[in-house]
């Protein structure tokens, strides 16, 4: 559960956006970063840790197994990066079809987006 340095990498319910109002407030803040496959919407929160929500539209990933794969990749990347991310509410939203994308390309895109987040 924890790495040798002692960083907690669990993905608990406290690290997720659950309610529609939480998602709406992040979208209403209107700050976003765009990558090759994903958009990362963000909003500072008053907590000590980052929280994540994932949106994958059927229009961009028609098959359920592809949508689930994209969500799993996003959650796993967030879980591994959460301790170094600023205290923001984040929404990872797919904005380009992933039919030809590899898992490595999706991971790299997310890693670059998380790295570009303002550290406020």
Swiss-Prot record:
SUPFAM superfamilies: Ribosomal protein S5 domain 2-like. The keyword RNA-binding applies. The keyword Ribosomal protein does not apply. It catalyses: Endonucleolytic cleavage of RNA, removing 5'-extranucleotides from tRNA precursor. InterPro entries: Ribosomal_Su5_D2-typ_SF (IPR020568), Ribsml_uS5_D2-typ_fold_subgr (IPR014721), RNase_P (IPR000100), RNase_P_CS (IPR020539). Coiled coil: none annotated. Pfam families: Ribonuclease_P. One of its GO terms (molecular function) is ribonuclease P activity. One of its GO terms (biological process) is tRNA 5'-leader removal. It is an enzyme of class 3 (hydrolase). Its EC number is 3.1.26.5. GO terms for cellular component: ribonuclease P complex. Keywords: Endonuclease, Hydrolase, Nuclease, RNA-binding, tRNA processing. Consists of a catalytic RNA component (M1 or rnpB) and a protein subunit. PANTHER family: RIBONUCLEASE P PROTEIN COMPONENT (PTHR33992:SF1). RNaseP catalyzes the removal of the 5'-leader sequence from pre-tRNA to produce the mature 5'-terminus. It can also cleave other RNA substrates such as 4.5S RNA. The protein component plays an auxiliary but essential role in vivo by binding to the 5'-leader sequence and broadening the substrate specificity of the ribozyme. NCBIfam families: rnpA. HAMAP family: RNase_P. Belongs to the RnpA family. This is Ribonuclease P protein component.
